[in-house]
Structures are given as C-alpha cells and as structure tokens.
C-alpha cells in the first residue's frame, strides 16, 4: 500500500514543499496548524509535529520530522502522533528522519530551530487551558544548561536550588537576574544571556532591567545584595552532589531486534554489520540511552507503523529511561546510526545518465557519427565551477622549499610547480573594507616529509610575524581549491622535483628520476573553466592517460602535438592554446583530433590503447557543517552545531567548518595561546576521524582562520557582521555589553588600510622577456595553422589585457561588465580636470619597488609609512585621482544596478520557453521588478543580497533562477 499526500489529514496536505519550519498541534487526535507567530511556544499538556524542510546546495529538499511530547501529554496521543509522522514521511517520499522529542530531553537539532530556547508553558488543549497571560507577574527561577543550545527548566524558587556548577535566571517583575555559578563555563554564561534577552522581550515587552550576579559576590555589590535579598539573604551554597546524568548513564551494549507483526526478536551476531539488515523488514537498535528504528525500503507502510508502535512501547518500558528515539529509512541513515555498526560500506554513487551518454557519444564520434546535442559540453559544465570569493588582482609571492630554507621564485616561474617539491605562497588582495592576506603551503604528491615539515614551520613563522592576520592554507597537489587556481591563474605542474631532499630520497631508494625536461617527452592534460582558472598537469606519457573530454599537449625532442578529445568544446581548446604558449612558446605544433591521429603521435605515447571519455570533475562542495572542537592529548572531540549562525562562534573555542571539499579551522581570540599553534593538527585529525562518514580525503585543503581576520571565502557561509569580532572581552562580557549598551559594541575594530590595486602585481623581473602567452588580440599573427575563424574566437575569448592575466580589460563592454560587476574602468572625461591630469601623470610615475619579504604586520607597515618623509606632489595627486576614480566607480555601479531593465519572471526562469537574451545569466533575479521579486523570494532585494552567496543560490534554485 502506497501513501500519497492526498491521503493525509487535510492540515498536513501540501507540507514540506519549501524551505522552513511547519508545526501542527494535536487537538482531539487531529493535527491543527500552528501559525508562524506562535512557533516556539509549546504547552506541557500537548503534542506537536514539527517539520523542518531544508534545501540542499543541489536544490533537492531534505526533511526532518520531529514529534514533541509535553510532560503532561497522554500515551494515546503520543502513539497517535507517532503514526502521523510515519504517514507524513511516506507522503514526502519516505526519506525523512523522524525524531521523538520528549520535554526536557530534546535533541540539539530540535532546540536549534527555536534559538535561544523553548520554555514550555503549563496547560494544554485537553485541560481547557485558555492560554491567557496572568495579570500579575509571577517570579520564576530557571536553570540553564548548554554551551551551544540552551536547555531551560523552571526550578523551585528557593536558595537551596542554587549551586556552583550551573547558571540560573531569576525573573522578577522589574528586573531579570542572571546568577553564574563559579564553576560554570563562560560559554554557558554567554548562552544564558541570550535566554535573558528572550525573557525580557517575551514576558516584559523589552522593558525591564538586567543584572548579572557572579557566584562569590557578597552583599557589598548592590546588584548581588538585591539578588540575595530575594532569597532571604546570603548563605553559602552547598556542594552539588554527584549524580549520573542521563547523558553519562552506562549502557549494556548495543542490541539489534527485528520487528514482525509488532513483536521483537533479538538478532544474534558477533558484530554489527549492514548485512544483518533485510530490506523487507524493520528493526529496532537499542543503544542504551538511544533507540533507533530502521525501515527497509521494501517494507509496507503498515509494517513501518507497526515498528513505530513497537518502538514506542519499547521506549516507555525501558530502564533506565531512554532519551531519544530516531527512525531512519534504508539508504538515508543518519551518521549517528551508521556509526553504531562495526562495518558500514561507503555510500555508492549512482552514475548519472549524462555520464553514460558520454561514453556512448565518444564511441559513436570515433566512428564518424555526429553526436551534437547528445551530451553537454564542458562549456555548460563550467557554470557549475564554484565561485572563488577571492579577488584575482592582488600581490603574489612564491617560495620553493629547499631543506630548511625558502627560495623566492621569479615572477615568470611563480605558477610552475614540481610534484616532488613544496612551496609557500603569500597573497595580498583587496577585500570589502580592508586588505586581506593568505599564506599557503603546497605539497607535491612526490614531496618528502623533510620539505613538508620545513614548509609548515616557515609558513607558521611568516603568519606569526604578521600578527596572525593572514588566513593560512594547507594545500595538496590534486586537491587544490578554486581560490588557489584563481590566485595562480595559469598553473602548471611538472613531474619530479628539484629540491635537495627530493633528489636525495630518490637516490637512496633507487627511484628513477622523472623530473620534467623541456627537451624530453612529456604529456600535459589541460583543464579549467576560463583564463582566470586554467591548469596544465603533466601526466604519464601513455595513451591510457588520454580522455575524450579533455585537451592535451604532447611534446618530444623536436615535435609538439596538441590533441583534442571529441567531447571538448571551443573553450577547452582555447585554454589549451593558452597553456601551449606557456609550455612551448613560438614552436610549430601538429594538431591531432581524436580518431585521426598520426603514427608519430602514438609512437611518442608508446602505442595506442583504450582510454576513458568521462570528464575528470572536481568534487562538489556540500552543505556546510559546523563543529565545536576540544583537543587534548592528541584526542579530538567534535560536537556538531545545527542551524548555525555567526553568534555560535565563541571566542574561547576552536571550530571547524566542514564543506567536504575544504575544511576551515576557526580560532577565537580568547583561545589558550598554547592551543592556537595546534590548529593545523586539529584540522588534520578532523580529516582522519571523518565525523560525518563522508570519506574525507586526508589531502583535503585546510584553512586556518583567526577571529577578526575572516576572509570572504569563509564569511560567505554566514550572515556576517564584522563588528562583532571587534569587541573586547570573552563571550559573556561581549554579550553583556550588547545587552547593557543597547547593542553597541564596546570597541569598533579599526579597519586595515586597503591599498589601490589597479592590476595583478608581482615582484618585477626585468631580466625575463615578456611572455606572449597571454597576449591574444584581433591583430595577433596566425600561428600553428590557425584559421581566421579560430583567431576571431581567440580574440573574443581573451580581449586585450594589459596584465596578461585574467582580470577584465580596462575598457569593458556591457556583457563583460555583467561578468565582472566589480571591475570598472575610469572614464577620465568624467573626472575633475585636476584629478584627470593627476591620473595621467601617475601613469608615468616610476613604480614603487615591491618588497620581497613578507610585511611584518599591517600595524608595523603603517608605522613605517608615518616615519617616512612627506609624500611628493605626484603621490598626492595620484591618491586624489584614485579617490576620484573610486567615487566615480561607486556611482557608476549604483547607476548600473538601478538602470537594469526588468523582465517578467516567466522569461527569466531557466526553463523559459521564451527566454530573455543579453542578460547576466548568473544574476537573473536582478531583472525582476521589485513586486515580483518580493513575491518569489518573500523578501526585498536589499534583504536578499545581505544573505550569504550560497544561501542566495539555494533560494534562486528553488524558483528556477539559477
């Protein structure tokens, strides 16, 4: 028997179709919708269904169903609401996770929906309680527990209730007191302050005083005296007796039971493996305090209901009492459930239909069949390339590691790495309101441990000398993040290495030296999404390394070949031409097309053999997960924080943001100085433990980010307010300051000076001839047998570019302006005459020499500048010109936004039958009218653009605008 949405109670029909929270209260065994303004209000005599719908980065919807049982609700109602959740899950496709939530023992995920807390009120529908607020305020005492989410419970208003370990809130008619036990943590005190604010706003209409009382303050403190006076005077608090909390109660081990016709039978096995679970059955997994129900995909809805009812009975009769009951469907098991098994296979990914078509298309095209339209080309897939969230016009310096020293590379060699070596890069670039810095280490696959250790040590010293301002990155060959490629722009990886440690290692182990030689045989695979992100990777010179979806460069002693797979696009081939200009400039080439190769080509590759056709793709970025970490004696404990915000980042702690393709380690300002240097170890341990069982590779990029210096590619995961990290004190002191100072920070953090970046700059190298690798133009001479049509394509692909890299050209066309909205060329005719002359003069000024050593810190740089002689007239004029240009650029940007044409939604959506032409396809929403925008997104444009980019993209996906 199948169960569809129309079989549900009318109140539940249509649920779970968009992101958000939906709540139903059970009245007379029927669900009744709870209005949004009442979300978070629960009554002890009632039961509720809470549905959380989340849109993933892929655009699919994920559902979590919780049924909450008040302490005074009946068992019959609990059973009825449990069955309703099974029906709702079936109607939603049978993929939801179901949670049984008991008042006082709610899961952290459930509590995270209703931050800062829930405070259930007495009464309910069955008791006839009318939910009317009492006329007189009643003094109440609450205990607060939790560092990340707060569990609030009303306790007797007597002095003996207080203790040294916990945080308490005393709510009186005119003032709210927070009492912090001397042994309570700073994080618990800070979180309790959020509850104080909630009580003030909810029960006092925001009109009452707040007082913080610390354990140990005597009557001499006025607020402490007032607090103790409410308890009849001060008296020493007794020591809290040691008790076994539910969370620490011992279990008798994990037991598995099969459920048939409502009866449970133990499953005997030496160890738990997935093979014990039959897809035609349901099971109960007893884990002591936790209880799981597993439902096979082939089970009927009646079987699932029966298993749920059996689990409810199992739950009620257990000793000691259970805390949580979670139901999962086969194929959609939670991490917690899978972790209970000794053996659980990695999730097998189902091949996409597109990949299957790719193999067929390659085979047919080799036979001369036209396969246009059968597969998507790389130009369409390039749209899926993640955004870098980093400016590509900054200053770059690169050092190669040789034992314990670092050697600065010349500008022309900065993007050419050897697989047997290690490198350090320092990159400074303009941020939104300050100069941003990144110090990274790159480890080649063949590099030796000695060089890796030296690279980490030297990079740490660089970051320390800059007062820990830069973000720090650990990058491994083959797992480079998009930010790295945008910084390098045209990146080449050669086989072998040149460091002394590498040479010594291969000599001692009799390993052949395969280090790249310009005159030898070498094969390069070309990849990337555009001129700002392209790579040439040297691979084994064998035909098995070819791929129908890629372009290649092959050179021998005196011959250069290019090879284009049949599934490559014109953009792929253009990238190959660009990389060819870097690897073998000014040399004639022999173009080879798949299926019509010459014998000489195959001879260089050692003969012809089979090779794949599927495009080598990067792992996709997943939805971010935030973890709070403690690291003692090389043992890492990580606690996930659900539905996280910036406020969850506590200054005393270290957090990890896991995005699957990259991991961020965030270090708070108040973290113990002895633990700050362990940040990289914490990140590496996190990869090793793989807490989400997502098969994290040990080579996954790790970023170390310090509080107050978060780069844009980190803050994009939050709705970020930079002023919050500009406050003094610990988490408790900061939040208390916000409460008592009407939300104003104690101290505005000074902004770092933002230098003017007109183009990508590096250490100048006059000894090197100007490379022609990035100088395509309409007038470029034909080379390597290019046709006029190809040269025209090259001209359109590149445009004339003064920095020979990836930034937009100075004079931008309307289409280019859409692609590069932040890049503007100044129109000197619009600048005041004096400023225009200064700008022209500045072009002839000698460039300031670039230091080849990393700056010690922004503050020390400013101090040095102040000590220098007064600026020359030309320098002053240049600054005035730049200031004028920047102002004009801002005005131009504002005018551009306001002057965009508007189009109907039906013409802008991705599947439109009458699509609009000549619009920026990455910003379709910008062309909606204000009325239609608010109708589709349920918010204004200003509110929308304040959201993190990934959240904007999620919303755009949900309305077919991305």
Swiss-Prot record:
<dbReference type="Pfam" id="PF02209">
    <property type="entry name" value="VHP"/>
</dbReference>
<feature type="modified residue" description="Phosphoserine">
    <location>
        <position position="777"/>
    </location>
</feature>
<comment type="similarity">
    <text>Belongs to the villin/gelsolin family.</text>
</comment>
<feature type="repeat" description="Gelsolin-like 4">
    <location>
        <begin position="396"/>
        <end position="453"/>
    </location>
</feature>
<dbReference type="GO" id="GO:0051693">
    <property type="term" value="P:actin filament capping"/>
</dbReference>
<feature type="repeat" description="Gelsolin-like 6">
    <location>
        <begin position="636"/>
        <end position="677"/>
    </location>
</feature>
<feature type="compositionally biased region" description="Low complexity">
    <location>
        <begin position="845"/>
        <end position="862"/>
    </location>
</feature>
<keyword id="KW-0009">Actin-binding</keyword>
<dbReference type="Pfam" id="PF00626">
    <property type="entry name" value="Gelsolin"/>
</dbReference>
<dbReference type="GO" id="GO:0005856">
    <property type="term" value="C:cytoskeleton"/>
</dbReference>
<feature type="repeat" description="Gelsolin-like 1">
    <location>
        <begin position="29"/>
        <end position="79"/>
    </location>
</feature>
<dbReference type="GO" id="GO:0005737">
    <property type="term" value="C:cytoplasm"/>
</dbReference>
<feature type="compositionally biased region" description="Acidic residues">
    <location>
        <begin position="889"/>
        <end position="898"/>
    </location>
</feature>
<dbReference type="GO" id="GO:0007015">
    <property type="term" value="P:actin filament organization"/>
</dbReference>
<keyword id="KW-0677">Repeat</keyword>
<dbReference type="InterPro" id="IPR029006">
    <property type="entry name" value="ADF-H/Gelsolin-like_dom_sf"/>
</dbReference>
<protein>
    <recommendedName>
        <fullName>Villin-5</fullName>
    </recommendedName>
</protein>
<feature type="compositionally biased region" description="Polar residues">
    <location>
        <begin position="863"/>
        <end position="875"/>
    </location>
</feature>
<feature type="modified residue" description="Phosphoserine">
    <location>
        <position position="883"/>
    </location>
</feature>
<keyword id="KW-0206">Cytoskeleton</keyword>
<dbReference type="GO" id="GO:0051015">
    <property type="term" value="F:actin filament binding"/>
</dbReference>
<feature type="domain" description="HP">
    <location>
        <begin position="897"/>
        <end position="962"/>
    </location>
</feature>
<feature type="compositionally biased region" description="Polar residues">
    <location>
        <begin position="758"/>
        <end position="776"/>
    </location>
</feature>
<feature type="repeat" description="Gelsolin-like 2">
    <location>
        <begin position="150"/>
        <end position="190"/>
    </location>
</feature>
<dbReference type="InterPro" id="IPR007122">
    <property type="entry name" value="Villin/Gelsolin"/>
</dbReference>
<dbReference type="InterPro" id="IPR036886">
    <property type="entry name" value="Villin_headpiece_dom_sf"/>
</dbReference>
<dbReference type="InterPro" id="IPR003128">
    <property type="entry name" value="Villin_headpiece"/>
</dbReference>
<dbReference type="InterPro" id="IPR007123">
    <property type="entry name" value="Gelsolin-like_dom"/>
</dbReference>
<keyword id="KW-0117">Actin capping</keyword>
<feature type="region of interest" description="Disordered">
    <location>
        <begin position="749"/>
        <end position="785"/>
    </location>
</feature>
<feature type="region of interest" description="Disordered">
    <location>
        <begin position="845"/>
        <end position="917"/>
    </location>
</feature>
<keyword id="KW-0106">Calcium</keyword>
<keyword id="KW-0597">Phosphoprotein</keyword>
<feature type="repeat" description="Gelsolin-like 5">
    <location>
        <begin position="534"/>
        <end position="574"/>
    </location>
</feature>
<feature type="modified residue" description="Phosphoserine">
    <location>
        <position position="787"/>
    </location>
</feature>
<keyword id="KW-0963">Cytoplasm</keyword>
<feature type="repeat" description="Gelsolin-like 3">
    <location>
        <begin position="262"/>
        <end position="305"/>
    </location>
</feature>
<comment type="function">
    <text>Major actin filament stabilizing factor and regulator of actin dynamics. Binds actin and actin filament bundles in a Ca(2+)-insensitive manner, but caps the barbed end of actin filaments and is able to sever them in a calcium-dependent manner. Required for the construction of actin collars in pollen tubes. Acts synergistically with VLN2 (AC O81644) to regulate polarized pollen tube growth.</text>
</comment>
């Amino acid at each position: 028997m199948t169960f569809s949405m129309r079989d549900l109670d009318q109140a539940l029909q249509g649920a779970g179709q968009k992101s958000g929270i939906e709540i139903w209260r059970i009245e007379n065994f029927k669900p009744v919708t709870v209005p949004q303004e009442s979300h978070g209000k629960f009554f002890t005599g009632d039961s509720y269904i809470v549905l959380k719908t989340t849109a993933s980065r892929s655009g699919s919807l994920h559902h979590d169903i919780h049924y909450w049982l008040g302490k005074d609700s009946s068992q019959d109602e609990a059973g009825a609401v449990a069955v309703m959740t099974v029906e709702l899950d079936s109607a939603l496709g049978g993929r939801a996770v179901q949670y049984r939530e008991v008042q006082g023992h709610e899961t952290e995920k459930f509590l995270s929906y209703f931050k800062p807390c829930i405070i259930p009120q007495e009464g309910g529908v069955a008791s006839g309680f009318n939910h009317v607020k009492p006329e007189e305020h009643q003094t109440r005492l609450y205990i607060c527990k939790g560092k990340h989410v707060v569990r609030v419970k009303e306790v007797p208003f007597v002095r003996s209730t207080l203790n040294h370990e916990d945080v308490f809130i005393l709510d009186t008619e005119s003032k709210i007191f927070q009492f912090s036990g001397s042994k309570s943590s700073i994080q618990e005190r800070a979180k309790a302050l959020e509850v104080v604010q909630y009580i003030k706003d909810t029960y006092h209409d925001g009109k009452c005083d707040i007082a913080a009382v610390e354990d140990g303050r005597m009557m001499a403190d006025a607020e402490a005296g007032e607090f103790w006076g409410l308890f009849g005077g001060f008296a020493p608090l007794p020591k809290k007796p040691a008790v076994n909390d539910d969370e620490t109660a011992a279990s008798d081990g994990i037991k598995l039971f099969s459920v048939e016709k409502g009866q449970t039978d133990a499953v005997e096995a030496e160890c738990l493996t997935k093979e014990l679970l039959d897809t035609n059955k349901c099971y109960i997994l007893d884990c002591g305090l936790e209880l799981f129900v597993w439902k096979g995909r082939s089970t009927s809805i009646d079987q699932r209901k029966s298993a749920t009812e059996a689990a409810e009975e199992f739950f009620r009769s257990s000793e000691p009492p259970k805390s949580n009951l979670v139901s999962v469907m086969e194929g959609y098991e939670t991490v917690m459930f899978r972790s209970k098994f000794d053996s659980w296979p990695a999730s097998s990914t189902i091949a996409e239909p597109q990949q299957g078509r790719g193999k067929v298309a390659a085979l047919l095209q080799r036979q001369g069949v036209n396969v246009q339209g059968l597969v998507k080309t790389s130009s369409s897939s390039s749209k899926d390339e993640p955004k870098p969230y980093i400016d590509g016009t900054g200053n770059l310096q690169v050092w190669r590691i040789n034992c314990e020293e670092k050697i600065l590379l010349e500008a022309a060699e900065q993007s050419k790495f050897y697989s047997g070596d290690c490198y350090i890069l320092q990159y400074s670039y303009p941020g939104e309101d300050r100069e941003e810095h990144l110090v990274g280490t790159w480890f080649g696959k063949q590099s030796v441990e000695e060089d890796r250790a030296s690279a980490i040590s030297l990079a740490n010293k660089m970051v320390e000398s800059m007062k820990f301002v830069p973000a720090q990155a650990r990058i491994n060959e083959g797992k480079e993040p998009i930010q790295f490629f945008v910084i390098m722009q045209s990146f080449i990886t050669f086989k072998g290495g040149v460091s002394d440690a590498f040479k010594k290692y291969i000599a001692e182990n009799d390993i052949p030296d395969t280090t790249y030689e310009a005159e030898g045989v070498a094969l390069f695979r070309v990849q990337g999404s555009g001129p700002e992100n392209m790579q040439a990777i040297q691979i084994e010179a064998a035909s098995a390394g070819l791929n129908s979806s890629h372009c290649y460069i092959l050179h021998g002693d005196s011959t250069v070949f290019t090879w284009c797979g049949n599934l490559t696009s014109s953009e792929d081939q253009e990238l190959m031409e660009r990389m060819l200009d870097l690897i073998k400039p000014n040399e004639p080439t022999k173009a080879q097309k798949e299926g019509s190769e010459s014998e000489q080509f195959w001879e260089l590759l050692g003969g012809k053999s089979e090779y794949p056709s599927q495009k080598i793709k990067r792992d996709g970025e997943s939805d971010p997960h935030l973890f709070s970490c403690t690291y003692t004696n090389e043992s890492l404990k990580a606690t996930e924080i659900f539905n996280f915000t910036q406020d969850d980042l506590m200054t005393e702690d270290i957090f990890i943001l896991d995005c699957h393709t990259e991991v961020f380690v965030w270090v708070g300002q108040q973290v113990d100085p002895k633990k700050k240097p362990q940040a990289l170890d914490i990140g590496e341990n996190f990869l090793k433990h793989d807490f989400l069982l997502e098969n994290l590779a040990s080579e996954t990029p790790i970023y170390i980010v310090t509080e107050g210096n978060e780069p844009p590619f980190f803050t994009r995961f939050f709705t970020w307010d930079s002023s919050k990290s500009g406050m003094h004190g610990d988490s408790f002191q900061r939040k208390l300051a916000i409460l008592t100072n009407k939300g104003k920070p104690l101290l505005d953090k000074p902004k770092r000076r933002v230098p003017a970046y007109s183009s990508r700059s590096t250490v100048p190298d006059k000894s090197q001839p100007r490379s022609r690798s990035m100088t395509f133009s309409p007038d470029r001479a034909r080379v390597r047998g290019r046709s006029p049509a190809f040269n025209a394509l090259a001209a359109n692909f590149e445009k004339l570019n003064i920095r020979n890299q990836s930034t937009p050209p100075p004079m931008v066309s309307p289409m280019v302006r859409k692609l590069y909205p932040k890049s503007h060329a100044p129109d000197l005719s619009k600048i005041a005459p004096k400023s225009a002359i200064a700008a022209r003069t500045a072009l002839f000024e000698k460039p300031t020499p670039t230091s080849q050593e990393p700056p010690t810190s922004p503050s020390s740089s400013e101090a040095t500048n102040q000590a220098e002689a007064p600026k020359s007239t030309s320098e002053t004029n240049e600054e005035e010109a730049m200031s004028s240009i920047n102002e004009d650029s801002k005005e131009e940007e504002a005018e551009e936004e306001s002057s965009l044409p508007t189009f109907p939604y039906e013409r802008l959506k991705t599947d439109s039958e009458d699509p609009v032409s000549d619009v920026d396809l990455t910003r379709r929403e910008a062309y909606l009218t204000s009325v239609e925008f608010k109708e589709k997104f349920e918010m204004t444009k200003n509110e929308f653009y304040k959201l993190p980019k990934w959240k904007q993209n999620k919303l755009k996906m949900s309305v077919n605008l991305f």
